[in-house]
Amino acid sequence: MQRTGLLLLLIASLVSPLLCSAEQGRVLKLDGNWKVEHVYVDEDSTSTNLMALISDDPTLRGRIFEFTPDKIKTSIPTASRCELPDYVSMDVTSINSLMSGTTEVQLSDPAKSYALPVKGTLDIRPYRIHCQNGAISPSDEHSEHWLVKLDEESIFLNWDNQSYLLLKKLADNATLQPSFACARATSDSEKTICHDSDLSSWDVSVAEAYNVALKQIVNTGVDVKSRSVELRKTQKRWLDERNACFVNPACLKKKMQDRVDELVELAKQ
């Protein structure tokens, strides 16, 4: 009987953490799709690592995170897939204290430096994310990832290159719209984009990246007219190339992802 009791205690000690972790996932109510609403970076930092991303970077903004009990999957091209995620409750702390552990440079007020929509003194309970298999992001093996449920519709998550993401909950069966009016779509490529939420989100990202690149040209004040004209010409040529994909979703997605990368790099100059 004594041995049986010890065996049961041993089993309970092994199973209990798993049950607690699963319970944390249910308490957090993460199941469903979440859209990257904002990308926060410290634009004043001189760190070359931070130049990998820009504020509200179109490569990340608009992407989808899918949370289920079995996985965390995202449409971010370079991201991995986190299988059997555990959410480990951390001590209550302030936003600033939490961010200080994941920023390269010590900032007096990280929330302010990153222009977050909340005060750095806000007390929150973060949850450390542990993937039993796989990873959330490309650098997951080198950094710790956590999330904060700001409210029922908002998640604050640390990401790569010392960036932070604000995720917004999507309604069940929500469909994403492209940057153009689908009612006026004429080409095969536009019609294909209109019928695919992922392609639609990338179309929006192309439009946002184009506007960011154009704004950067204007902000430099150097050869604004000629460079703006050249940007419009290259965008027109790219649209012709995109339309050559016709109804091929993989081709359309690749074209749009590559164009977003090109425009974001231009915006960094």
Regions found by a protein language model. Give the residues of each.
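A short tyrosine-centered beta-strand micro-motif
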Residues: N33-K35
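Positively charged n-region of N-terminal signal peptides that target proteins for export
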Residues: M1-L7
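Short, conserved, GDST-rich strand-edge loop motifs in beta-rich repeat architectures
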Residues: D44-M51
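N-terminal alpha-helical modules
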Residues: E23-Q24, K29-L30, V39, S45, ...
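Short, exposed beta-strand/loop patches in secreted or surface proteins that constitute
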Residues: R63-E66, H145-L150
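Bacterial N-terminal signal peptides
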Residues: L7-P17
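Contiguous, well-ordered beta-strand patches that form the walls/edges
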Residues: Y40-E43, F67-H142, V229-R232, D240, ...
